[in-house]
Amino acid sequence: METNNTFNAYDYFKKLAETNKLAQSNNFKACFCSGPEGINDVMQEFRKYANFIMIDDTTSQNTYSKGVTFFDKNVYTVFILASYTFDDMRDREEKLNLCRRIFRQIHSRLIYDKNSMLYGDSLEYLDVSSIYSKELPRYSMNGVTGLYFMLNNDEPVDLTFNADEWQED
């Protein structure tokens, strides 16, 4: 039972970042990065933008069996980062609290969108009931604080063998 789910999680997360009023009022730029290593490339734009919501365009994946069918688990990661005045721990705490608030608003929007079927059944397999998040340590990036969160999406996949896909010896 493979789903014909054409839902684009990356575009969805970018839209959430671009339409959140708190993120807009604090000039967060929505963009993509390729894994944690890609963050440094985006950081080069800190001269133009002080705050970012970065959607990791790579996923961790796992295919597993759950009884009679198989599922593809995709793990999506989103970084919410804000710059602060270097060595100003009060400013750092304020910016970290801002990132926390944006994350909570995004989480509540995920729950709302899934429960209201706003996107049809596209969000059906998105696990909004358990989202892992981790805050950046104090000195992980000079002058930058924030957090990232990870969201699982488990979709059925059809792994039925099809002999027509194989050349016989």
What does each model-identified segment do?
Residues 62-68, 131-141, 162:
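Catalytic micro-motifs at enzyme active sites that drive phosphoryl/nucleotidyl and oxygen chemistry
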Residues 148, 158-168:
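Intrinsically disordered, low-complexity regulatory tails
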Residues 62-65, 83-88, 156-162:
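Short, cysteine-centered beta-strand-loop-beta hairpins and adjacent loop/turn segments enriched
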Residues 70-85, 142-157:
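Oligomerization/assembly interface segments of phage tail-like spikes and tubes
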Residues 24-26, 96-154:
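Acidic-leaning, charged glycine-interspersed low-complexity segments
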Residues 1-68, 164-169:
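Small/polar-rich, solvent-exposed N-terminal microdomains that initiate assembly or binding
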Residues 2-11, 69-73, 81-112:
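Extracellular/virion structural assembly segments
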